[in-house]
A protein has these predicted regions:
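N-terminal catalytic cores of peptidoglycan-degrading enzymes
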Residues: 1-5, 22-88
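Conserved short hydrophobic interaction patches
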Residues: 36, 40, 95-103, 135-149
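A short beta-strand-loop-alpha-helix capping motif that often carries His-Thr
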Residues: 53, 108-121, 160-165
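Amphipathic, soluble alpha/beta structural segments
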Residues: 58, 111-137
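Short, internal acidic amphipathic alpha-helical interface segments
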Residues: 78-119
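A contiguous, mid-protein "functional segment" used to position or interact
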Residues: 125-165
Length: 189
C-alpha cells in the first residue's frame, strides 16, 4: 500500500463512529464499528446487530473477551475479568477499587453474582478510531496487569491446592508459574 493511500485510509477510518453513522440506524452504526475494528486489524464476532465480541490476547490473562456494544448515543464496553473471589474478599475488592481511580475509559465492576468485569461507556459523538484503539488497549492492559495479583488475593488457597495436586501427580505446572512465589513450598526454602 502506498503512503498516500495508507494515510487516506487512516483518515477515513479516523472519522468518529457518529460521523460515519449520521442517520443513526443500528446497521450503519454497526458498519462504522466494523470498519474501525477492521482498520485496527482486530478479529471479532458480530453475533447481533451493534454488538461486537473482540478477543484481546495477553500474557498473564491469556484472553480477555471484550464486548463493544454500539447504542443509540453511546459505545458500551464490557470484559469479563474473573469470577467472584473464594477468599480474602476485603483485600481483593480493595485492590481493584484502588485501581479504578487511575484507569481510563473502563473501571472494575461487579455483576449480581459478584463476578468482576471491566466496564465503561463513551458518547458515540466523540468516539474515533484512536479512542477505540486506546479503549481496547486499556482493557487489555488493566486485565493483564492486574490478573495475577487479583488471583493471588482471591484464590490463593485454591492455587496452592492445585499446585500440590499437580506436583503429586507429575502434571505440568506451566500455567501456574506466575504463582510459584507463594504456591510452591520449595520456593520459600
Amino acid at each position: 500500500m502506498t503512503g498516500d493511500r495508507a494515510a487516506g485510509d487512516r483518515a477515513a477510518a479516523d472519522r468518529t463512529v457518529a460521523e460515519r453513522a449520521a442517520d443513526r440506524t443500528v446497521a450503519e452504526r454497526a458498519a462504522a464499528m466494523r470498519a474501525s475494528l477492521e482498520s485496527l486489524g482486530l478479529g471479532y464476532e458480530n453475533p447481533r446487530p451493534g454488538a461486537f465480541l473482540v478477543k484481546l490476547e495477553g500474557q498473564h490473562k491469556l484472553a480477555t473477551m471484550t464486548w463493544l456494544v454500539v447504542g443509540e448515543h453511546s459505545l458500551g464496553v464490557e470484559a469479563f475479568f474473573c469470577r467472584q473471589p473464594d477468599e480474602n474478599h476485603e483485600a481483593f475488592y480493595r485492590f481493584l477499587l484502588e485501581r479504578n481511580g487511575r484507569m481510563y475509559g473502563v473501571h472494575f465492576t461487579l455483576d449480581e453474582t459478584g463476578d468482576v468485569y471491566l466496564t465503561g461507556r463513551l458518547p458515540l459523538s466523540s468516539v474515533s478510531l484512536d479512542d477505540i484503539d486506546r479503549l481496547l488497549g486499556c482493557v487489555l492492559s488493566y486485565s493483564d496487569e492486574n490478573f495475577d495479583a487479583a488471583l493471588e488475593l482471591g484464590f490463593g488457597s485454591a492455587i496452592r491446592r492445585e499446585w500440590a495436586w499437580r506436583v503429586k501427580r507429575g502434571e505440568s505446572l506451566a500455567n501456574l508459574q506466575a504463582f510459584a512465589r507463594f504456591a510452591d513450598p520449595e520456593a520459600g526454602a
